[in-house]
Amino acid sequence: MNFRGISYYLGLSCYPVSFLSFFNILYSSYFDHYLNLDSYILTLFVSFLFGLSFNFFSKNSEKNIKFYEKLILIFVVYFFISLLISIPYYFGNYQLSFIDSFFEAISGLTTTGFTVFYNVKFLDPTLLIWRSTSHWIGGLFFLIFLILIFSNFKNEYKLT
């Protein structure tokens, strides 16, 4: 199994989370919403460091992975990125448990829209943007994984 190739793609999938947490930090500082700013900064550093470490681990490796490795990659990315997305929910001021914050991140990443919040209208704007960007990341990852699965599909199962 090509663990270095899987870690390369896992490292690449950490960067959209760090970019969108940076966007959320800019939004929070511009509109003076400092309520959960430290959790977004933590998410930025954790996701960027994990992305760098996974890419450093996979340096000078084969980037072409097989079909079953792609399926394992999809499972690992959905689990790991959900852990990264759940950081602002868990360390925010809403006192969510780890399970609730992980559920909120999974529902955002899979774009189902289920929530643990009683009324979403009364959340602070930065958490609403984080919630909507997690839905956006989920849609983006879904499209990327469709392309990843069906790329070189005819060459892997070629009849000779």
PLM-predicted stretches and their roles:
Residues 1-160:
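Membrane-proximal intracellular helices of multi-pass ion channels
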